[in-house]
Amino acid sequence: MVFATGRMSFKKVLNAYIKNWQEAKKKLPADYKISLNLFVAYDTDYLKTQSTDYTNLSQDIVDQFDQIVFLGAKNALRSIERLEEYSKLDKKELRSIFAAGYAGKRNAILFAALENHMDYLLFLDDDEYPLAVTKSKEVCLWSGQHIILSHLMEIPNADYTNGLHCGYISPIPQIPFNEDFTEDDLRVFIEAISNDILNWDN
């Protein structure tokens, strides 16, 4: 479960997803084994917050996860240093990948997930609750949606799942093509993550 955020209110959304997860577990087969992990990449500059606004979670939330990884600006710098050792990208290119803002935070999470050997990631919007409103006659009803369960059941058979609660697709940083990273490499990547917003044709 992943959040790229700069809003303190993400903790309220996270709490709603914990309740969503507790309901989802009831619908899973008894022998379905899942290790649930939380990755939070936070931006303290976005709304002038501090790291503890994101890292100070209630024990009830902490107990739901097998592992929690927080990623702030210092983590991005350490990622750049580690990648510099064995990457063919230079420091400027690496800084563009882990830049401030939404895309840089998502990229930091992707790298941390690789380092932590995650099988799947579910990016969730930090300002959308797992709810939907429907109109029934003259009344509007708020109903829970099975966001986590839906993705969990589909992702083992897919390269990528996406939905209305998953946030925007990360902008891809500008990296010049060379013999190590060709236009065809980028095309394969784009096709793997393509959807109605981002695909090879547009």
PLM features per residue range, with description:
Residues 1-56, 85-86, 93:
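N-proximal low-complexity "stem/linker" segments adjacent to membrane-targeting elements
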Residues 3-4, 41, 124-125, 163-164:
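Short His-Asn-centered micro-motif
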Residues 7-8, 45, 127-129, 166-169:
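Short, solvent-exposed loop/turn segments at secondary-structure junctions
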Residues 15-26, 105-110, 142-151:
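Short alpha-helical segments and helix-capping/turn motifs at coil-helix boundaries
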Residues 37-38, 119-122, 158-160:
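Beta-sheet entry/capping signal
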Residues 46-116, 141:
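Active-site-proximal specificity loops/subdomain of glycosyltransferases
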Residues 118-135:
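Short beta-strand-to-loop acidic/aromatic patch adjacent to the donor-nucleotide binding site
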Residues 131-202:
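Conserved catalytic core of nucleotide-sugar-dependent glycosyltransferases
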